[in-house]
Amino acid sequence: MTDVPPRHPPRDSGDAWVEGPDGRRFWGRYGAAGLLVHDPASGILLQHRAEWSHFGGTWGLPGGARHEGESAMAGAIREAGEEAGVPADALEIAFTSVLELGFWSYETVVTRALRPFQPSIGDTESLELRWVPLDEVDALPLHPGFGASWPQLRGRLGESHRIVVDAANVVGSRPDGWWKDRAGAAARLLRQVEALSAAGVDASEFGLSMGRTWPQFSVVLEGQARKGAPDGASTPREQSDGASSPGEQSDGASRSSVQNGVEPSMAALTPEVTVVRAEGSGDDAIVAEVARSTRIAPGDQATTIVVTADRELSDRVAAFGAEVRGPRWLLDLLDAVIRP
């Protein structure tokens, strides 16, 4: 969580102090962002701040001032790469948390480590970089900003959100001529879900506080719609009934690369969209997908939402603890992402 100017002249117009109406100063003309990397086996990656820096000697997150026009996610990834050698391709985004003061903001970008890596000091802002077990974080002298946010951040590290989409039900809820080309309609829905997966979902949709979260999406296709697939280079991960469970990546699975306001390099950090092509009943495939999700991520912090208006299916998935939202809920989220 770097909020101090470098010792050399500013490299970007964002490298400047902002002063609030109460006289407090914060680093970053366009706001600032920090990266929290969580590895269940190692803990979280922390930066021991150089003594000459603001709140020097404390521990916080790699990060710093955002550049003009730069998203918080891009800024956090860039700063963590520069300061700590964090490889972007080793990360998957989980959620963001925002401190908004009106005249300045700080966004914490929380990610999961997909593979082990060793950080490396890249500039003079760090005395040390260390993986710290969760239970040992509070024993360190923490940067005041990070210390204030850590209890809430820690409480969310174990959360898991999955959205299972009844594609036939969602497509059929919008009279746009889908019946003329079921496969084409399914392909359009998949592209839209990929865009939403890349952009993330407002945390309030899951009853959480400010920020965004990146759920795992599974889209279940049946009948003629099973032929549907997005055009272009981007292809969601696919599985048929009985294939590997969501979260178990198969060889050759590719990550989504979606525009719609999301930088291509940032889209690579988002969870993959899983396409389930039902061999038989689509409802049975959805129930099986929900059951797999429950086994993969059990517990109070695991949320599974099934998008359907089918009452019988709703009752079946509710037996596994899944929530049910109607197609309109998902369509509103999709429209918000793809609208110019």
Residues of each region from the PLM?
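Short, basic and Ser/Thr-rich N-terminal targeting/leader segments
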Residues: 29-32, 105, 213-215
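Anionic group-transfer/hydrolysis microenvironments
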Residues: 36, 50, 135, 168, ...
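Acidic, metal-coordinating catalytic segment for phosphate/diphosphate chemistry
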Residues: 2-36
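Unchanged
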Residues: 65-158
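Short histidine-centered catalytic/ligand-binding loop motif
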Residues: 60-69, 177-179
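A conserved beta-turn-beta hairpin within the catalytic core of GNAT-like acetyltransferases
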Residues: 53-57
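Nuclease catalytic cores that cleave nucleic-acid phosphodiester bonds
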Residues: 159-165, 169-241, 246-340
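Entry beta-strands of beta-propeller and related beta-repeat scaffolds
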Residues: 43-44
